[in-house]
Amino acid sequence: MGLIVFLTIGIVFLLIGLTANNANDSIKKKKAIASFYDLKATSIEGEEISFDQFKGKKVLIVNTASSCGYTYQYEGLQKLHTLYGKDVVVLGFPANDFLFQERGSDADIADFCEKNYGVTFQMFSKITTKGRNQSPVYSWLTNKDLNGWNEKKPTWNFCKYLVDENGDLIAFFDKTVKPLSKEITSLF
């Protein structure tokens, strides 16, 4: 009887330890292999934006959609931009990858974001976050051979990636993690 209790307790502690290790799988600190600062993307206004202008700042990259249950997160992203904008850049990438929740044109998206959420952070032209036509930005974010460690692709709209001030990807956050959560802001 004592041996069974001892083994059961040992197994429970082993499982707790394994779970604790898995909780940190979304936050890493490894040097990127390909430079984040070599990336470029087209702004929602149609201008090419070079990521080298973000050197020295943390960058939060979010795949967005206007007709999603998580669209309310635009408000939190804007607040984050307002509160931390001196040190943190928010980049929004509209995508129509999940149940066609971003059907509008770039002009429609820009208008929606401004009217409904007062968005002033940098928004980009609509992209694809996965598959054959994946944007170069999301190729870098989701390919460990480029970013150094991460292969997690967006599972839905409003997944977030955090790049540090040296251009290294340091964290991935699922759609349920709100922009102003401690999980994110503790890394600023």
Per-region residue spans from a language model:
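Amphipathic alpha-helical repeat scaffolds
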Residues: 43, 63-67
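Short, internal strand/loop/helix patches
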Residues: 107-156
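N-terminal "domain-start" segment that seeds a small globular fold
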Residues: 24-52, 72, 136
